[in-house]
Swiss-Prot record:
One of its GO terms (cellular component) is cytosol. It comes from Aliivibrio fischeri (strain MJ11). NAD(+) binds at residues 31-35, 80-81, 112, 135, 172, 289, 313. It catalyses: NAD(+) + (deoxyribonucleotide)n-3'-hydroxyl + 5'-phospho-(deoxyribonucleotide)m = (deoxyribonucleotide)n+m + AMP + beta-nicotinamide D-nucleotide. This is DNA ligase. The active site is at residue 114.
Amino acid sequence: MSIEQTLDELKQQLNYHAYRYYVEDSPELPDAEYDRMMQELLSIESEHPELVTVDSPSQRVGGEALDGFTQIQHEIPMLSLDNAFSDEELEAFEKRMNDRLISKPVSLFCCEPKLDGLAVSLLYVNGKLVQAGTRGDGTTGENITENVRTIRCIPLTLQGEGWPTRLEVRGEVFMPKAGFEALNERALKRGEKPFANPRNAAAGSLRQLDSKITATRPLSFYAYSVGVIEGGELETSHYQRFVQLKSWGLPMCEETKQCYSLTEVKAYYKDILKRRDALKYEIDGVVIKVDDIALQEQLGFVARAPRWAIAYKFPAQEELTVLNDVEFQVGRTGAITPVAKLEPVFVGGVTVSNATLHNADEIARLGVHIGDTVIIRRAGDVIPQIVSVVEARRPTDSKAIVYPTHCPVCGSNLERVEGEAVTRCGAGLVCQAQRKEALKHFVSRKALDVDGLGDKVVEQLVDKEMVETPADLFKLSAGVLTVLERMGPKSAQNVVDALNKAKATTLPRFLYSLGIREVGEATAANLAAHFYTLEAIQVATFEQLIEVSDVGDIVAKHVLNFFAEPHNKTVIDDLQEMGIHWPEIKALDESVPQPLAGKVVVLTGTLHKLKRNEAKAALQELGAKVTGSVSKKTDILFAGEAAGSKLAKAEELGVEVMNEEQLIELLN
């Protein structure tokens, strides 16, 4: 199996399990297995940086917004943390930072337990809580303001004085152990299904569409950082910022502590690990941050995490259970994934009943049989893997796992390309399983974004043989849709309206919706920007394709193969006949100068005549690089009303400042 193929499979697996974990709150793997897969992906990408794509799980923070909530945009991305699993990895983290800082090594850390809950953002304007949101995918989250207002420890109005006019507080909503146990006891008495663990209970409670239900749940909150700060200043120490937040009525974890060396950090980790079971809440490690805010800003961020913080995870927890069966699932690209069906076992705070077996090679490596007693590990405390077989306990009636030769859904022959570990069904949309996944992808938020056409609706449409190709979706009428479960006339008409609305799209979205292997959002955008038209992409040669940013040999081959397939050409023609269209992309006139080419600019404050995202896009068209913070590298700060601390910092650094009127004049 080639490196590229290994990466491709890892991305598919990580994206699938991230969706199960972050969106459906129904993980199939222990954290340990997910972390292992992510570490493998990060290791390969570290050794082969040319293979890193914008759509890699390493470049994003997992989790999409649910359809039931309105969405919010995070002004400053809410990133996740990189993980360490040993003292050596912690020491490497410190070395990486000091190598970047050179002149001033890190000498003070702020440490706190890593709570196992749901990350949220609280926005206070003039001391009033005006908005609360989930982390979502890091840039877009769910608006859960009404639910958060029911959490009694979160102040609706800040106490004291001195808080900024706009202050974003970030933290973790969680359910204490005692509250979780009481909640499950009540559920059992009512004959209801109990929650598997406090994290799922917290997430499920916070994402209730009815805030009255949330109000009955024993939720709590600890602040762990700040985001937007405008119209005021905070302390320059991370720990002292906690003290400030506490003085304003925001709860902080009592175990938070400053450590003056890595030796003290290690001692703190061991102490928390020792006292873990005695704590009032579930944790899966400790978070270590550089305490000096100036050093944090100097160190900056990578794509998915800050360079100045790391989560030191606790060791994996293991349990014995029995492998009852193996199911073979079919993914969007035809990849066959064997899923172990386990005797449910409580390990690391989660009841585990499924685990991935990856592929035939992994099954052979483990030598696992149906009926075997196996060791399940949850590394990092949340996602499961079978690490070994207890052969001494193998029953006499155990059965060897027989890998299928035909697709378990459509019956087509399975193929395994030499050098690949993955077995695939090559039937494409003829295969019902692939058809379902392809259609789900086609209508997803980042593709054609068809509101109301969720996974369950798509599955019904395929099961009832109402659609075969994406173009068939646009032939559906409200009357036809009403035969589906839970689809009344109004909902059916809303779906038809959403489908009609989705016909007006963009070339990047359309390319992404086609589900070409390895072509994520960024690659689709790069292809569109390079070739301008779909026709040009369809006839592009291998040599032309690899000239596109982020397109290497493997992606180029996938694109060529996709457009060489007659069936795919037919699907595209049918979609265009159904009215799918997009605006023309105009080639950049290189004779027209870009006045902001190479300039680093920042937008801050309230704009009255422009929307912030429109202003950002317009500035980028003029060649500017738009960033979220002011530094010595900033060339221009565009300041709206109540610009706050960014304006003060720009003036201190001598950065050019323009108001909204000057911004509009420049854009015109």
